[in-house]
Amino acid sequence: MSKEQKRDLFYTQSEEQVLSSMGSSLDGLSSDVASKRLADYGRNELDEGEKRTLLAKFLDQFKDLMIIILIAAAILTVITEGSHGLTDAIIILAVVVLNAAFGVYQEGQAEAAIEALKNMSSPVARALRDNHVVEVDSKDLVPGDIVLLEAGDVVPADMRLLEANSLKIEEAALTGESVPVDKDLSAVLAEDAPIGDRVNMAYQNSNVTYGRGLGVVTNTGMYTEVGHIAGMLANADETDTPLKQNLNQLSKVLTYAVLVIAAVTMAVSVFVRGEGILPALMTSVALAVAAIPEGLPAIVTVVLSLGTQVLAKRNSIIRKLPAVETLGSTEIIASDKTGTLTMNQMTVEKVYTNGQLVDAKETLDASNTTLRVMNFANDTKVDPTGKLIGDPTETALVQFGLDQNFDVREVLVSEPRVAELPFDSTRKLMSTVHQQAAGNFFVAVKGAPDQLLKRVTQIEENGTIRPITDADKQAILATNKDLAKQALRVLMMAYKYVDAIPELESDVVENDLVFSGLVGMIDPERPEAAEAVRVAKEAGIRPIMITGDHQDTAEAIAKRLGIIDPNDTEDHVFTGAELNELTDEEFQKVFKQYSVYARVSPEHKVRIVKAWQNDGKVVAMTGDGVNDAPSLKTADIGIGMGITGTEVSKGASDMVLADDNFATIIVAVEEGRKVFSNIQKTIQYLLSANTAEVLCIFLATLFGWDVLEPVHLLWINLVTDTLPAIALGVEPAEPGIMTHKPRGRNSSFFSGGVLSSIIYQGILQTALVLGVYGFALLYPEHSIYEEIHADALTMAYVTLGLIQLVHAYNVKSVYQSVFTVGLFKNKLFNWSIPFAFLLLMATIVVPGFSNFFHVSVLSPTQWLVTIIGSGLMVVVVEIVKFVQRKMGLDEKAI
């Protein structure tokens, strides 16, 4: 077993303290020590955890009460009916096994997420071993190893930095911050500093974008920050979706109802009618078969699958089927900021030049020195395909130049760079020197306004250079402050001309400068995101932002998107540091007042999601980074990003946006609401039929009739009803579906008038079937009892089958007339009804089938009676719907 590693607060300690704590030095470890530590601590990789066998996953699918009752019914059918009941049993068991196989297919997402985490790791690291730089498999790194870093590297383990030469590391996947972090060894950090502020640390799987560094490995494997997230993923409790909760509730209700009714029926058969135990048991089994909609699990699966196909065409890839319906229940959309609500691409938004603040969309003159400086003092590379490679801030400046028709590659041909002073975190400046055609040199300097303004002695306005005044400086500082309030990252541009290449010292190169301008940049919101937020609010959904980025940036983007009111001066931002001060109970009391959470860790995100879930809300969480994975898994529906998202976040999600478009979520919510509405229709359709079947058998038992046989019920439930039920699952959305409030976690399939419809429509079907059965007995066309009984049995069976087909039209809407919702809008429905009719008729007219189904040939008169009986189903339901609309029940159900 691997030795436990310390997860100390290394960022609060000096380099010397950390080296001492890790038993290391700047010379690195010896090979012997490294080998011993590898044996002690284990490899630098993530644990896979104990994997369940395929058989265990398969057996887990049979824990549902309804499935157990179905299996019991199949076994009892064989016991009581022998070979005659074998066909019924095989049909039931086939449905059960197919459903279980699909359930197994849906499992295993946590393992996939952890595998993706493993694949992100850097394969090779450069470490100091035996006082030499050697390439080491990153999985063989151990605590105490000294590792070298340079631009382009993936950080192979968590480490405390010992050297940082202009080192910048992009940590967006861990922190959500879109700008690479300038690493600073001199920083003194508090114990509660969030990951994004730990500027003297480098974390596994982060990307080195600039400079060089040296660090001592502090943690490997599952003890790294990424490993910590992997552990959270593996141990996360997945929340049952509202659909699963509803299906579980439905299973329990049906199961208990079946047991009670079967017991009562058996008691009546034995004690009232004096039947033997075996015949009574056969009747009870028939009733169980009638009561349980055997095809429901499979039909729900098919409806959800069809929903996934619709969503796939609209850029939403569903990874877990129940997520389709969960979308429709969503009450809270907790969105990550970077890459989800924003473009994850730094962009120039404002330029202050010639004493004026202009929008980036306005055209600048190609000779504008601000434009020249931002492109000259820049290390961005352009690959052959035109892709910009480098620090996101610098690539934003070059992209702005290209948008202004200023191609720095062309300009540098005539004004080549001949010297430079690289950026470092102490000066916070970068300077380059460029040869001019006249023989002199142009010095371009960019950097932090507070550092650069002190080195400026002149200012340029419209081509004229003059001494800078205090009033000029106040105007520059005021503009800088105004841009910073908008959460823009501000850089200052300055320059000077010199006669010779200066001595490359900061005091020489970066003094006596001419102020040129300010540039304000931000990772901007997606163009369609604000409209999506508005539509979400209109649909009764509350969008909130959860990000690891800075408070001011988060608040500014949230106001621009409408997540919080731009005119409201109250503090709407809650930080991770503040959250650390609260217990879960304390946070539960205040969380509702905040719409934006900034500077939060993965644990914080999970706490926020759980707080909303504890309040009974259905939560959708979006994200694209490694840091989002635990909360994606905890949420009712985790939504990953297909383009910018890490494989880890995709693996932990239920749904992936193929276009990374926040607005696509709203489209998916509409589809989800439609899917739930259609599943409701399917359940209403099936359960009203099952109610009728149960009542028919129960009443037949009570009065000594023989109305329907188990094979009739199985054929209707599994074959005749299945096609219309599936077709109802793809009905078009009813008008106004996105103006309703979300149905919420605690609503059921029986809400909105569905339960009352199931009851009265089930009773109505029973009355019509028994009415036709009674007619056949009262007005027989034969004199022999067996033939009379065969006709009555056949007419009852045909009437029930036809009622199911016409009733499918009734179920298109709970309250609206079938003639207003549209008879022929659903193409699948249009052909499913006649096809189901042919399947029903096949059992009567196809030779061989009639004997198997125990039916007789009906006369024209008998056919007319069955058609009238089934047709009355539509007439009566239409009358009831008309009365309900007059009473306003349709409006109350919304």
Feature map (PLM): residue ranges:
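Generic alpha-helical transmembrane segments
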Residues: 720, 794-808
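Alpha-helical transmembrane segments of multi-pass integral membrane proteins
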Residues: 757-772
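Extended substrate/RNA-proximal surfaces in nucleic-acid metabolism proteins
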Residues: 785
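A C-terminal functional module that forms or caps the active site or interfaces directly
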Residues: 811
